[in-house]
A protein has these predicted regions:
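N-terminal maturation segment of proteins
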Residues: 21-585
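Bacterial N-terminal signal peptides
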Residues: 4-17
């Protein structure tokens, strides 16, 4: 059959279109294969994450913390980078392109972290296996005999974990990558505290106190005996050996200067910390100035409240708050109940503010006694993706009589709802994006959202009690102070006492928190910057949308836009916001 010239053109176009469509599909499949392989590799090499996410495949082991494995991980990252860059993303769906960009950034940042030898300083009083191991016990499933046997296998491997950790830290001593003495002394106190817990009170022993009905009495007896034996002969001796290493070898080599500038290549490393935690290209000087400006703004707003309540200045008002026992917790349970009440009132407001709400519930509990002296005022622990395990707001009740109840409301919104619990839970339950994006964190996004959530409470009419509103501002100025003191410590060579003095001059934070927070910033360079930088950006995005859309602005749609793609670097989130604004006009 003859075909005319015009028919030939149509045929060529038709087959080209099919080939192009197949090419897009093939490339999309290849890209998603990279995402899947990467995530499975991550779970395989980070079994603790798999456990938290409800994946039982690796519940009999821990991560390999050895230097050799660190170097192997670099090679794996290189391979994934090559695979991503080999795929042409032109014409692929927007989410595929975004996922490729996010994974590429993650891999490159991981490699940079290794180059700065972060792994040679693997523990501090905020993060470290010394308390992350017992904390993990609370989320390990114990449904059958295999779960218990896996747990016993893990307990027996604790000595190897600490041996690897010790070897890494010895390399750090040789390279000059060591924590300040004040940080390592706090780690030593934590390690000794856990090692000294009596067997039946040990968090490692807790799984024996309640067995599923399906496990026979004989098996319960065997399991209890093997867990007891592993704690006595593997876990506790490993903690004790690590304590001796800290005391006799590591702490004597500890830094006297608290700033990260004091380690080799410290200034470049701090620039990396800024970039990693803010996801923006900002200098320490820029951030320092933003902090000074925000402190001044918050102090002016706080003075308005103090004046309304009859006080001429912040100093006299702060002194009155500290001296009034009615404004402080009378018991640990009262403090916890205050958090619960604040979360309940916010929960009722959520349908007005968000289109997407998570399945996972939320509970409030106290920080374990063995870590409370060094832990923050409150933290959040995510629930499981299927919603069966609730998220947890973990409140530090140490020295409860010093804790100003006026600050509880804003912290509850930050750690719980609409803060971390909402953001993390929605991310875990997302569909249509790769698994790695559901669990990814960017400090400026996650902590910026937490601080945005505190302000959102004000925007929708909460903080009716002036002391709670003052507490909100105290929390806000706290985060502004972080910009000043973190950059002060790690870029401007501030001493620890300068940080303490700045806190005293510009806040009424109780002394326990002043000391604890100061040491936190010493131990964790740059992390504290993400809160305020992220909050200011999110507020900027919302104001931009409100200004440009006017009556068309929908707060629920805006919040869903921010949360429904998982955590994003702020520059990519800004692109998403700008595209959304254009689509709504």
């Amino acid at each position: 059959m003859a075909v005319g010239f015009s028919g030939l053109i149509v045929a060529v176009f038709f087959f080209t279109a099919i080939a192009g469509a197949q090419s897009v599909q093939t490339r999309s499949q290849a890209l998603n294969a990279v995402f899947t392989d990467y995530w499975q590799d991550h779970l395989r090499h980070t079994p603790e994450d798999a456990t938290v996410l409800g994946d039982k495949r690796y519940n009999d082991r821990w991560s390999d913390l050895s230097a050799e494995e660190i170097h192997r991980s670099v090679e794996r990252s290189r391979e994934y980078i090559q695979r991503i860059r080999a795929i042409d993303t032109a014409g692929l769906p927007m989410q595929d392109k975004l996922s490729a960009e996010l994974l590429l950034r993650t891999l490159l940042e991981d490699q940079e972290s290794v180059q700065f030898r972060e792994w040679e300083m693997p523990v501090n009083q905020i993060h470290g296996i010394q308390f992350e191991l017992p904390q993990l016990v609370a989320v390990i499933p114990f449904d059958d005999v295999k779960d218990y046997d896996n747990y016993i296998a893990r307990l027996k491997r604790v000595p190897l974990l600490f041996e690897q950790l010790t070897a890494d830290m010895k390399l750090g001593i040789d390279d000059g990558h060591v924590q300040p003495k004040i940080v390592s002394e706090k780690v030593l106190a934590q390690v000794n505290s856990i090692a000294a817990i009596q067997l039946e009170d040990s968090p490692f022993y807790a799984p024996t106190k309640k067995f599923p009905a399906s496990i026979t009495t004989d098996e319960q007896r065997r399991i209890t005996g093997e867990i007891s034996d592993a704690i006595a002969h593997d876990v506790i001796p490993a903690y004790q050996r690590f304590a001796r290493f800290l005391e006799t070898q590591y702490i004597p080599h500890g830094r006297a200067d608290p700033g990260i500038w004091a380690i080799p290549n410290g200034d470049a490393y701090y620039a990396f910390c800024i970039r990693s935690n803010t996801t923006l290209h900002m200098t320490a000087d820029q951030i320092h100035q933003i902090g000074l400006d925000e402190v001044k703004r918050d102090e002016a707003a706080m003075l308005v409240i103090a004046n309304k309540l009859g006080y001429k200045d912040l100093k006299s008002f702060n002194a009155a708050i500290k001296a009034n026992p009615k404004l402080h917790a009378a018991s640990k349970e009262q403090l916890l109940d205050t958090y619960r009440a604040d979360l309940e009132q916010m929960k009722a407001k959520l349908p007005e503010l968000f289109g997407t709400l998570p399945k996972a519930g939320l509970i409030v509990e106290a920080t374990p006694a063995y870590t409370e002296k060094q832990r923050p005022a409150a933290t959040y622990e995510p629930g499981s993706p299927d919603g069966k395990r609730p998220g947890r707001v973990v409140v530090n009740t140490y020295n409860f009589a010093e804790i100003d109840l006026g600050g509880a409301e804003s912290i509850a919104y930050h750690e719980g709802i609409p803060g971390h619990h909402l953001q993390f839970s929605i991310a875990l339950e997302l569909s249509g994006i790769p698994e790695f994006r559901k669990k990814k964190e960017y400090t400026a996004y996650t902590e910026g959202w937490g601080l945005y959530a505190e302000q959102l409470g004000k925007d929708v009419g909460f903080y009716q009690d002036p002391y709670s509103d003052y507490g909100r501002l105290q929390g806000d100025i706290w985060r502004a102070i972080r910009l000043v003191v973190d950059t002060g410590l790690h870029s401007k060579h501030w001493t620890r006492q300068q940080v303490v003095d700045y806190f005293h001059e510009h806040s009424s934070i109780d002394e326990t928190n002043v000391q604890r927070e100061t040491d936190r910033y010493i131990a964790w360079p740059g992390q504290a910057l993400g809160y305020k930088v992220g909050q200011l950006k999110l507020l900027e995005f919302r104001q931009r949308a409100q200004t440009q859309l006017g009556a068309k602005f929908d707060i629920k749609k805006f919040h869903d836009l921010i949360l429904d793609s998982g955590a994003l670097p702020l520059d990519l989130l800004e692109n998403s916001v700008n595209d959304w604004i254009a689509s709504q006009k």
